Amino acid sequence: MSNSPWQKSPHSERDRPGGLSHNCIWILSAIACASAAQAPERLDRGMVAVHAAANKVYVGWRLLANDPPGVAFHVYRSTAAGNPIRLSKNPVTDSTNFVDEAAPLDRANQWWVRPVVNGREREPSPRAALPANPGERQYLALKLQGAYSANKIGLGDLDGDGKLDFVIKQPGSSIDPGQGYWRRSPDTYKIEAYRHDGALLWRKDLGWNIELGVWYSPLVVFDFDGDGAAEIALRTAPVDADYRDADGHVLSGPEYLSILDGRSGIEIDKVDWIARGAVSDWGDSYGNRASRHLIGMAYLDGTRPSVVVHRGTYTTMRVDAYDLVNRRIGKRWSWNSDQETPPVRGQGMHGMKVADVDDDGRDELILGAAALDDNGRLLWKTDLGHPDVVYVADVDPAHPGLEIAYGVEVKRGENGISVAEARTGRILWGVKHPTTHIHDQGMLADLDPAHPGLEFYGAEADGSRFWLHTARGELLATEDLGGNSPHALYWDDGPVKAYIPGPSRFRRPGPRPQLPAGARPAGAAVVSRILKYKGAQIGEITGRIVGLADVLGDWREEVITAVEGELRIYTTTIPATSRRVALMQDRLYRMDVALASMGYFFPPQLGGKLFE
């Protein structure tokens, strides 16, 4: 099944507050609706050219959901601003990439494509360029404004030109509010917006009242007002006052949800964040549980994206939903887990998942081991407890609808690793042995073509045990695939993913390590391998992974890394022999990419099948 609005029609919206009834005609995976409907993000061809090896230049571009069936492409090059040369003898039909083996690399070059429909060439795409003597490298570099690295990044078209731009939060350090981890913030976070070409658009200092840590400073980049350009929604506080106590905690003072204009960084509007109240109301006296903040977006009415604000993870959870209409933020609904009967406690995750789990055209919110319907009412809860690992995807193709893969942090006698039905929360399968603390992000991906569906990997926090299961729960392996959080990605060709092993940093018994004064270190520019499961190395990247998505080029994914002074966007240079619509035009995938700018980093999942 598919969870993309460009691939299926929602049911009629009825019997829901604010619902709209509309009929849509769905043609070639693109929307053609007679009335208001969820509009796909405008994307251009995403041209990319990298000097892959020797005299070879890899060129890639996007296939779009609204391309006519049978569209083909001619590939062109211009050298030193000279006349165009057509490189493709025949239109390219079986892929959206091309290897140019004759480019004069001692001079500057540009590449572009022209779609061919019914034998006639159409308008050219934007161009990808390489300077003279570019050197061999498999990434594009976006230079930052100083010798710092990004902590988190958000992707979105900030100026409406069809190209994805970058919003970064810097510096790269992050302090956890937990006891034994917290330290006084040595610096303030700055939000910086860069165009796709590296030009700095604006910078905003969040000030001392937003402490230096992921959980204090969530942000999300999305087009909330439907004007074709993305905004930034984030937690803010006054910058002209200092609410730190003597130790450096910020446990008092105003807190806001702000929405910033993507082009300028100017605040469009702000409203109060979910109230802190008494810090102890959240489960401790020192601010850990009160300082767990998340933000996201969801198509709660099936038409326009709402901003979703979340406070609390381990005990109480509160959620507010807002709409940006006529440049004003208005509340849609609120939910308080303590007002349920019985109260819903201890079910939160370190992030948020958004998906249309009941196939009604409107999004639900997966908060961890509990879910809210689009109207802000509790849809279901599993009572598994706080999960570290949460993925929503079409895990098992034989089971209708979406599933949720869980790795549970709290100690359990069974089901610590499990897969649930996303519509109802019903456990489909789970391990029958005890687990102590399934930690970090695990991995969910089609790694082994011998088994249908997606394989699910999870590990104990101390590194004592590892499990790889099939989509149906069959145990495949108990080997360490790279710590608690290896990252899977489409890198070569076909439906099977490669993966990047994570660092083997395990929580061992005993006192927690004393971190350097200030914050957790961002990490050195480590070199990581890209591997096939039970296979060879097929790539290599440098830097700390801060993004993974189909950012440009064909349907394979790019890896975005942070090194001091720059972002690197690594792209595959392995020629593909197949073509697929850009993954960013899958609804579930696009929402996952947007949500990766806050909380735990979970690589995005598709709502439908990549290969039929």
Q: Predicted regions: what is each one?
A:
Residues 1-10, 15-23:
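Short, low-complexity intrinsically disordered segments enriched in A/P/G/S/L with frequent Arg
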Residues 2-4, 33, 157, 223:
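Short intrinsically disordered, low-complexity coil segments enriched in acidic
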Residues 10, 40-42, 54-56, 63-68, ...:
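Beta-propeller-forming repeat regions
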Residues 20, 49-50, 560:
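A structural signal for short hydrophobic beta-strand segments in well-ordered beta-sheet cores
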Residues 22-26, 30:
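Generic short N-terminal amphipathic or hydrophobic helices
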Residues 29-37:
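Hydrophobic h-region of N-terminal signal peptides that target proteins for export
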Residues 38-50:
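Short, compositionally biased P/S/T/A/G/V-rich stretches that sit at domain boundaries
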Residues 73-75:
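Short beta-strand elements bearing conserved aromatic residues within extracellular beta-rich modules
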